Amino acid sequence: MLVIDAGQPRNRFAEHAHGFFGQDGKPPARIVADAAAQLAAYPTVQRIAGETRTAERDASGRFHVTLADGSRASADRLILATGIRDVLPALPGLAERWGVSVLHCPYCHGYEVSDRQLGVLATHPLSVHQAILIPDWGPTTWFTQRIVEPNEEEAALLDARGVRIERSPVVEILGDAPRIDALRLADGQVVPIDALFIGARTEMASDLAQQLGCAFDEGPLGVAIRVDTWKQTSIPGVFAAGDASSLMTNATFASASGVAAGVGAHRSLIFGLDA
């Protein structure tokens, strides 16, 4: 088995990983390094560093990939664990705080910022759901950015949850990065905030699935490669795992789907692609 690792995990911006059973509190780079060391114990596995640029399936059903350095590799089965990228809003001061004080998931990072002043920055209509959830971790202000207005039911929930609503757009994040001290609004207000949650839109981190002709499912924040129970895509012999193949993303889900894809790929080599 050949593993081609581009070295660009989605969570590389975070100081520590959370919500990943058995790995809680570890830096993402350490998790990857530990995994690489464990793989090295298996003589049937080869791991190389590199970026895969192209992938194709020949008439016999065999797959061929080309790396950025021009080298090529071929295989009977292909597992895409190419991941996704978070598309951040163009707000001054946001990118340099991503993964530290600007966060995407309360289930991954909520405990670490609990009982502090929390904010939710709207980037799409579903951000109202995040604003309703976040008060379980601390006092919450929802910044609508004039993107969305709550309906009657949502407004009642926000009120019941004690969420403060600010409709004047956030124009700047204040404080020594990666820390946040406050948010400056267009109307001149400065609102103290310790951590800011954003449900960022996402995009594929690689176009390999598109090159191969894989089907996709549309989600509220982006797309995911369509897979079956064994993580096989719409292209026979191509499997997908991790955030690229799920509309609900988390390191534990990604790891579990990798197990399913590996088992599915192996079973297909023994029993055939239709088994």
Spans of features found by a protein language model:
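Beta1-alpha1 glycine-rich phosphate/pyrophosphate-binding loop at the start
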Residues: M1-A33, Q117, P125-V148
